[in-house]
From Swiss-Prot:
Transmembrane segments annotated in the record for this chain: 4-24, 26-46
Subcellular locations according to the entry: Host membrane
Similarity comment text for this entry: Belongs to the plectrovirus ORF2 family.
Keyword annotations of the record: Host membrane, Membrane, Transmembrane, Transmembrane helix
Protein name according to UniProt: Uncharacterized protein ORF2
Family matches, as InterPro entries: P-loop_NTPase
GO cellular component: host cell membrane; membrane
Amino acid sequence: MKKFIFFFKNYCYISGSMLLFSLIDLLLWIISLYCVGLVFWILFVLQCIYFVWWLWKNIFYQLNSFGLVNFVWDNPLSVIIGKLGTGKTLLLTYLSQTMKLLTDEIYSNYPLEDDKVKVLTFKNLDFTDRTKPVPPDDSVILFDESYLYIDGTSPHDEKKVHSGKIPWIVLARHFGNRALFTAQREGMIWNNIRQLASGIIIPISLKKPVIKKGFNFFNRFFIMQIGIFQDITDYEIWKTKSVERTAEGKRVKHKSDVGLGIRFFKIIIPLEFANKYDSQWLKFVRDLKNDEIVNKKEYYWSEITKLSVKERLELFDIDILKKNLKPKKEKGNGKDD
């Protein structure tokens, strides 16, 4: 039943993304009712071409959605790597909805407007912690901004602090957990996770809905192209070759290779999924700092000339200048004049 509901919803999303073309096809059909001869057959052929295109696209996107769900389910550890704005959190949120096809145990470390998604922190995965439990069998764990929790650029230092997470990382598949971690660079992900990850997901491009007055009904979908790799080494090789082709002025190839476990495909993400999370939910951290500041006076640059040199130096807070321009203590004379 879940698969049928998922298929039907996906069908509606995909059909909705092509609604404008469907209206054009309907218009052609209405016109053809009043035409005869060559014009009728031309319109008939155009309708047939549209129908074949619509059917192929619908099947194409349906298979891609099912393929992504199965890929995540088959890999206990996956990482999503992409620069700022490529849609990493959007993809996690999309999976928070589509993975319900296989399980009801969904956890995330960032807020989602979904009553079925549970809160998770890094302590849930720490075996030295005795306050929060490890998620049960068949759980999907969505972990955004992993760099905020573990500094992947300092693996040796982090290993001392986060050694309690290693048992979970190694035994995730035995626990029936499926986890996804995001980062802007592969080097930002902790080495213990990166090397054991059997799923590498790369958001390559993201076509956002264009918000225009009167056309919002036709622009309620994101189209994301992603690449999936089964090993970090395969991804690094592909990335190196892509950089070389770009440097030579050539187009980067997004060609799937089933033998190497490399696939590229597109998925449609409804705008309603994107509205389930706040991309700036961590802005409360700013308030933690600002609430402790007593003097919150701000200056305009036009007011700087009214300050003394010493006040300017204190205001700009340039440590090197403050250190070197600090008045030296005068040495006292050894004997009276």
